[in-house]
Amino acid sequence: MRTLWILAVLQVGVEGHLLQFETMIIKMTKQTGLFSYSFYGCYCGWGGHGRPQDPTDRCCFVHDCCYGKVTNCDPKAAAYSYTIENGGIVCGGDDPCKKQICECDRAAAMCFRDNLDTYNYAKYWKFSAKDCQEESDPC
């Protein structure tokens, strides 16, 4: 019975975009996005420029590029639906725009998880903008 309850809880969709992305990050990395990724490297957080500093920063660069390709809605505001299944994220819903946003966030959260071994809080947290002057890679 307990297993069925856990499965039911894990399949509940979440609403509210920023909360959704934060929850994805926590589920995949066991770290809060706000404190672990908001001011990391040259791309994690609002904006972004220069060359990504490490694999985690590259996750944010790719996420920014992904948002740039979303059409017909605001990627930072539109709420979408998803579930956590078998340790992964599955985007749902019928709205193509919301699904694109979800896929961008899913890919970033999974990328953060896959690069935890190179995450360097001491070196890249609140990284100086003056160190992000190299030419950016193209999306």
From Swiss-Prot:
Subcellular location: Secreted
Active site residues of this protein: 63, 105
Keyword Signal in record: yes
Entry-linked Gene3D superfamilies: Phospholipase A2 domain
GO CC term (a single one): extracellular region
Binding site for Ca(2+): 43, 45, 47, 64
Catalytically driven reaction(s): a 1,2-diacyl-sn-glycero-3-phosphocholine + H2O = a 1-acyl-sn-glycero-3-phosphocholine + a fatty acid + H(+)
Tissues of expression: Expressed by the venom gland.
Disulfide bonds: 42-132, 44-60, 59-111, 65-139, 66-104, 73-97, 91-102
PROSITE patterns linked to this entry: PA2_ASP, PA2_HIS
Listed EC numbers: 3.1.1.4
Signal peptide segment: 1-16
UniProt keywords, alphabetically: Calcium, Disulfide bond, Hemostasis impairing toxin, Hydrolase, Lipid degradation, Lipid metabolism, Metal-binding, Platelet aggregation inhibiting toxin, Secreted, Signal, Toxin
Flavoprotein is among the record's keywords: no
GO molecular function: calcium ion binding; calcium-dependent phospholipase A2 activity; phospholipid binding; toxin activity
Single GO biological process annotation from the record: lipid catabolic process
Free-text cofactor note: Binds 1 Ca(2+) ion per subunit.
Origin superkingdom: Eukaryota
UniProt cross-references to SMART domains, sorted A to Z: PA2c
Listed cofactors: Ca(2+)
Function: Snake venom phospholipase A2 (PLA2) that inhibits ADP-induced platelet aggregation. PLA2 catalyzes the calcium-dependent hydrolysis of the 2-acyl groups in 3-sn-phosphoglycerides.
Quaternary context: Homodimer.
Protein family: Belongs to the phospholipase A2 family. Group II subfamily. D49 sub-subfamily.
Record protein name field: Acidic phospholipase A2 H1E6
